């Protein structure tokens, strides 16, 4: 083998080593990437080019290559300095950096002596395979090499190292401590000799940026200052951001100068700051604008008692001198970033005089310097990131004057948990085994959203996966298992644990996190022990003081709680009681604004939570067993006493302080189902609105709600709920009647709708998209369930919608059908609808897909509000009608124009739809004339009805008259009530109990003109019904402490089936007490007794789904103020003097009938009824000028026979009446009976009583008899008695009682008088009472003696 071949083979091996190293070197790759983006190096071929250049150098490159590899290894160490701090000390770093810089210049000189292969004239590598070079180029080697990129590369490496060297001076002097503050190292727990480095394990947490409006709302409620957060960025939106976006500009280009990062314990706040400083050292582009970054730990600063300047303070945290720092602050203060970690107990009182330095060289107490930095009295041009727990965040935000951004750190998403597991276990098989087993435990997966807990779980899984999966259910259980494992490894004694707890407890009471060596020794701990604690060297003047701290503040809180239960019973209980008293006396809860409820910076609540967890015997037993102690017996004894205290304390937390979330966390840690149920048994409503809920909070809520027996309503508005969090809450949400919450996008509730559709408890679900979200429009979703039927409403907040937008959707369907469509997909399409334009080619397909989602729901009714009715929407509507046979009514309201293209398509296709279709909007006109232009903006309403309904309408001659719905209350005009009902007149007969009704209808929606009852049926149905005197219920009502607010109706379904029944009530829902809706019940009188159930109310009716009938009415609890719609009847009983009986009574057809029967010998005088509702059970007085009125006052009553005013008016004149409330003398109704009307009545009375000077001697009744009732009784006899049918038909046509076609059939057909009269009576029977009165009057006019020839009647 030739020497040349051997040298080249060795060279290739060396080059391969170099190539592998470069491929893996992150700093080198980042350098190459930066160069390639500037057009200097082709990144895709940089390594191949480098290797080709070295290959072409031949034998001469050997020595150079060896030196290069050696120093590139040094470069790797330097580049990774901040990732692996313990490797180099400062002196060694400076010496080796100097060596590299000397070698760098030698390389540049020597490279010019080497030939290279593969570079063209522009320095771009030639194409070709590296393994088969085309041969060396001999010509112009010196010139080519001088212009090659290899020299530039080495110079760039030098510059890179110089920057790293400079930035390394800003790192904390105690390099070892720098990487151990947030993560316990493997070395400290003696699992291996390697440290757990920050960079390889770091996993980015979820950070939420809050909008200005949301932050101001939270902070103003906390600080209560009109100037709160005035410097927040005005165009920040609530959204998730990454670390590199903390200083990104808002939509207006404004960049924040202060970033507040708040979050719960263990969420990774300190980690984020350390990652920022490492990214800055490694030249990450999002922090490249800063020339200096200083990290200040607030807990250490509080230990510095001497006064100093800011420059002196900063020099303690890095290797720069005060003079060097002073120069930086003076020359480029805008390029300085301060990272202030852990301001958890910040408070500022403007009335307390403290030193306020305004110059970096001015001396002051350290805490004053930090206050001035935060209050923008020092270095206003600089930037600040401050981390804090929740309660200090609001006050910090209110003090900062720089442009500010408010953020929260939530922890890991599920995807980030997986990423962290992979980094922790490194080995792919171990990772998969651990993560897949953990995923099956949803509770553990939820806890892993807290980064600190995630690390502890990984640590425990590595030691004993099976035990972890069965035992870890609470936060306390994770800490117990972690501590037990470490104690087992280190063989620590019981005294060690007690000493550790004593130190922690003393620190809790004194608000102390750092301990000197004397304090540690006093408790019996060996300062050399590093389990659970870290050492810190704090600069004090010219010496370093050794201090100790717990690995994490939460460990101090845990050990303090553990200490309490390790004491003897008397001392333990004394300290626990003291803990409770401290919580009350310091009024911690009072200082919490809504979003911070349950998230306190003070450690006492956390100690209390751990204490509750340790009193769970299953949790603490593993720790006690390893210690071989008798503590478990003490725990059992103390637990009984603790429960007594908790029974008093936890309800007080909720009732007095509104501190639900923390109380529920305590209950969760106990894991005692019977106890939790007992504590929460009285809770019917939980309101956590504006509390930012974490995944762990949702887990706690789900557990407690499932054990809350009487929970009825939840309010989770503005709680940052996501689909993942709703999934955790799902098992409990179905247990409530009323749910209110908000989400970022409605599509996140798609799965929840599917689940809740099966709930037998849910009555109302209200969801809206977060008001602080990024996107517009925002949608709201309302769902109500009544007796198996669902009313679903979707409303948009859009004020300037696009052409194809749908603004509102309102539908009804059976609850059992609601799960038959994919609501997630439907809601996603709904949001997309607003993004389409008039010319969008996707418009047709999208609208079709949107409406087709509703085909399978079993729609009963659908209301759409559209921007414009174009051909796409018309086509979609037609398809929906054709495919949804259950649809009974479809209404389309158009806010813009009804385009002719859409209308033509509808008219062509809907000649005989199976349901009623109503289109309303403004008519579009293509004519350019001025007149038509005006008409195009006129509102129109177009109806498409089934022919069957049109035929029914022709047969139903229903003039509402006095018996139909005639309520014009303006107070409740906005209360929902559908008016799309076909009004029908039933046949009437007299039974033993009074008037009864019978009717047969086809499928549709109908209203009885007599009783106002409504019903919905899918097919033919025959009903027999009547109004019942409700006095028989008075005893039961007294027992129930209720009053009736509706007639009592007894309905019998002879054939067919009713889908819905709507029973009339006379309450005014707008004017009554807001609690009325929940206090109303439907009463049913059954064979077994009475039953009560909830009922849905509309404006005038109580809605029952798929009713099973027996006598029913509507009740309301006594004591709730109720206003009702009232009717008025006035009867004149005497003419000289005039005596009037004036009745005010709830709108009840039976009551009206009974009054008229009682007053049948009197003369009714018409007067307008009260349009405003009147208060039930409230005294009212009637004032009539120049008249005597008795009694002085009456109450409006529903359960008893109506009372009335009697008015005596001696002089015939206009009679003005004023009804007023007695308590405040407020007038509620005014009416006038004109003198002329009274004269007419008086003359008519005389004419009725006397004809030709003598009284009627016939048996013919007076004209004041009830003609409608007379017809109902005698219509069979009238068929045989009336002969002049043609004349009667003439007058019926004239009065518009019959139509032209029917009139022709009577006149021209060769029928007998009896046959013609039978046809007329059939029509009249279906008419209203007014129709019957007109008919009898016509018969009497044509045949005055007719009544004498009929059998006598009781009527």
Swiss-Prot record:
- What is the name of the protein in this document? NACHT, LRR and PYD domains-containing protein 1 homolog
Q: Which GO terms describe its biological process?
A: inflammatory response; innate immune response; pattern recognition receptor signaling pathway; positive regulation of inflammatory response; positive regulation of interleukin-1 beta production; programmed cell death; proteolysis; regulation of apoptotic process
User: Is the keyword Cytoplasm assigned to this protein?
Assistant: yes
What Gene Ontology molecular-function terms does this entry list?
A: ATP binding; peptidase activity
InterPro entries with a match to the protein in the record: CARD, DEATH-like_dom_sf, FIIND_dom, LRR_dom_sf, NACHT_NTPase, NLRP_HD2, NLRP_innate_immun_reg, NOD1/2_WH
Q: Which residues form the NACHT domain?
A: 257-458
Chain spans, region UPA: 1110-1252
Sites marked Cleavage = 1109-1110
In the UniProt record, the gene name given for this protein reads nlrp1
Name the family the entry cites: Belongs to the NLRP family.
Organism lineage string: Eukaryota, Metazoa, Chordata, Craniata, Vertebrata
